[in-house]
């Protein structure tokens, strides 16, 4: 008896998978198993609104680049005109700001010295 190319026995070199052979499943059952592993929305054949990657709009450009220590969630959040003051929560702590003695600029508190120097800060001591 001659075996057909579709029924390869164990030990044939045509299959490159190293896993032991399992029971054959019809394509419909295989598709159902894949859909059920992806969740209920995919099993029904519909993609939930908002998750379709082709329908998403391109995000608006940020004004400033993300820097070390910035939260990715804060960087992509759109600014709203409703609340000019950001609200501190557990997920997005607000950086403390302080006015310098001349009252003309805001400074960040608790900036590590290496970050300050890397941003062009002067290594000399400040007069207080």
Swiss-Prot record:
**Taxonomic superkingdom:** Eukaryota
**Annotated segments matching region Disordered:** 1-96
Pfam families documented for this protein: UPF0731
Per the UniProt record, which residue ranges are transmembrane? Answer: none
Q: Which InterPro entries match?
A: FAM229 (IPR028025)
* Bridged cysteine pairs (disulfide): none
Q: Which PANTHER family match?
A: PROTEIN FAM229A (PTHR35355:SF1)
Name the family the entry cites: Belongs to the FAM229 family.
What is the protein's name according to its record? Answer: Protein FAM229A
- Can you name the source organism? Mus musculus (Mouse)
């Amino acid at each position: 008896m001659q075996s057909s190319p579709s029924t390869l026995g164990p030990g044939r070199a045509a299959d490159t998978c190293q896993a032991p052979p399992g029971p054959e499943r019809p394509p419909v059952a295989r598709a159902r198993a894949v859909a059920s592993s992806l969740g209920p929305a995919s099993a029904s054949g519909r993609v939930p609104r908002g998750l379709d990657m082709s329908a998403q709009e391109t995000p608006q450009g940020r004004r400033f680049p993300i820097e070390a220590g910035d939260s990715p969630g804060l960087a992509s959040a759109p600014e709203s005109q409703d609340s000019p003051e950001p609200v501190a929560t557990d997920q997005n702590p607000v950086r403390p700001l302080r006015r310098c003695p001349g009252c003309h600029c805001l400074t960040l508190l608790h900036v590590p010295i290496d970050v300050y120097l890397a941003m062009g800060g002067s290594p000399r001591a400040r007069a207080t």
